[in-house]
């Protein structure tokens, strides 16, 4: 009895041990299922993280592209102007004015500091200031032998009046070539139509009006100069309209194979055309380049037209050719235009290259050179000192894509390595338990 009672519990333990033995082998399976669910959750989290990061990259890239058209150019000689000489003369107004230069044929913005629509009355307003506000009145009693010459004023008074004229005419621009202020024209192109339109002549016109002829009292010199500039501006607009007509004709005809971004072509052509009519330096820009650089931009961006060959699609000669491209000498008096970065419309998400010629909202700016409209001028020496203004290649876009792809691959590799470590840890964890059970059985 005692022996039987002693042996039966041991037999029960053996039976229970045999019954529960398979359950020890089920634990690794449960751990592997939990590890699998963990891997799936981690993979889903990684996937959504990649999508979110890609979305943030796209949003930041779009914001950067929109912010690249915000200009902060200031006049080079800003010390000539008092802070609040005229309404709207502050930095914000100039930023608005310069941002308008990115449009190939748009109207200038409403800005009280920069006016092109009231250019006809600019001389009358200046004459009004001379008569009623005493802007040009001498600060000391006039001598009896005072003549109409402005040289009778002391140097300090002469300098202040000259600065006032600069400040005044800096706030007026042309109608079509609206990237030019009247001050730029007076300083760089003082002889339109054989007229004397220098600042000294205008000072003699207004300062010496009291002792001069009645014609000078009415500001005839100022009005004549403004009208001469307006005639050149109108002539440039007529030439631009002729070019626009030809370009539209080629685009609307199905027998011509034009492949180009028309907004680019029209913007750079207007910039080059105005620079040919007005041989002046753009002074409100900090960084300037030779205006002849614009010629190559037109040749590069305007479409290649093949009206007599239906077989070729992307070949042929450009519709605009720059001559005298071997000219390599540099003149000290050469006009300089703003160093503009031309952003192709391809970078704006436009898939259709045959854009209508009426689309004039391309992101560009344009500035000045040369009075006569000749298809020439390019200085190769410029490329040694400034970045090229050639069309933006796909290198920058591909660089961003490659960067995102590399980051994605690295994240996937890291995830796979983490999964391998977790999987190895799960498979190795039940091994000590199996060794213990075998030792107990022994």
UniProtKB/Swiss-Prot annotation:
Localization of this protein: Membrane
Entry function: Probable component of the NALCN channel complex, a channel that regulates the resting membrane potential and controls neuronal excitability.
Alphabetized PANTHER family for the sequence: NALCN CHANNEL AUXILIARY FACTOR 2 (PTHR15819:SF8), TRANSMEMBRANE PROTEIN FAM155 (PTHR15819)
InterPro entries on file: NALCN_aux_factor_1/2
Topology term for the membrane: Multi-pass membrane protein
Any Gene Ontology CC annotation: membrane
Keyword line: Glycoprotein, Membrane, Transmembrane, Transmembrane helix
Name this polypeptide is given: NALCN channel auxiliary factor 2
Transmembrane feature ranges: 42-62, 406-426
Top-rank lineage group of the source organism: Eukaryota
Family classification: Belongs to the NALF family.
Annotated glycan sites: 77, 100, 171, 279, 354
């Amino acid at each position: 009895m005692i022996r039987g009672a002693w042996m039966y519990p041991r037999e029960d333990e053996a039976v229970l041990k045999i019954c529960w033995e398979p359950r020890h082998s089920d634990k690794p399976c449960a751990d592997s299922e939990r590890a699998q669910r963990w891997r799936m959750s981690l993979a889903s989290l990684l996937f959504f993280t990649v999508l979110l990061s890609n979305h943030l990259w796209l949003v930041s890239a779009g914001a950067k592209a929109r912010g690249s058209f915000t200009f902060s150019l200031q006049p080079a000689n800003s010390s000539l102007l008092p802070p609040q000489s005229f309404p709207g003369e502050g930095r914000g107004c100039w930023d608005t004015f310069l941002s308008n230069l990115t449009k190939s044929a748009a109207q200038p913005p409403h800005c009280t500091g920069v006016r092109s629509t009231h250019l006809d009355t600019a001389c009358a307003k200046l004459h009004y200031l001379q008569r009623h506000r005493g802007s040009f009145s001498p600060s000391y009693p006039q001598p009896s032998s005072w003549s109409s010459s402005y040289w009778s004023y002391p140097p300090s008074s002469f300098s202040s009046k000259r600065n006032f004229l600069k400040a005044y005419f800096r706030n007026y621009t042309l109608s079509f070539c609206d990237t030019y202020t009247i001050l730029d024209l007076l300083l760089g192109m003082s002889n339109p139509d054989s007229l004397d339109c220098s600042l000294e002549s205008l000072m003699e016109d207004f300062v010496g009006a009291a002792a001069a002829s009645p014609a000078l009292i009415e500001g005839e010199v100022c009005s004549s100069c403004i009208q001469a500039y307006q005639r050149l501006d109108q002539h440039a607009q007529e030439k631009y309209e002729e070019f626009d007509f030809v370009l539209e004709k080629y685009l609307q005809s199905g027998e011509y194979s034009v492949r180009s971004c028309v907004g680019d072509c029209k913007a750079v052509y207007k910039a080059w055309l105005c620079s040919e009519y007005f041989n002046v330096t753009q002074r409100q820009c900090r960084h300037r380049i030779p205006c002849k650089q614009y010629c190559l931009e037109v040749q590069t961006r305007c479409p290649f037209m093949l009206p007599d060959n239906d077989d070729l699609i992307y070949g042929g000669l450009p519709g605009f050719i720059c001559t005298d491209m071997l000219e390599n000498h540099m003149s000290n008096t050469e006009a300089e235009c703003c160093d503009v970065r031309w952003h192709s419309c391809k970078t704006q998400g436009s898939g259709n290259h045959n854009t209508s010629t009426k689309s004039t909202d391309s992101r560009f700016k344009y500035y000045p050179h040369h009075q006569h409209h000749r298809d020439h001028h390019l200085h190769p020496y410029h490329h040694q000192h400034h970045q090229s203004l050639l069309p933006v290649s796909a290198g920058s876009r591909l660089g961003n894509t490659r960067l995102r792809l590399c980051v994605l691959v690295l994240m996937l590799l890291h995830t796979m390595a983490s999964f391998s470590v977790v999987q190895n840890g799960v498979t190795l964890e039940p091994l000590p338990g199996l060794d213990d059970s075998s030792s107990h059985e022994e």
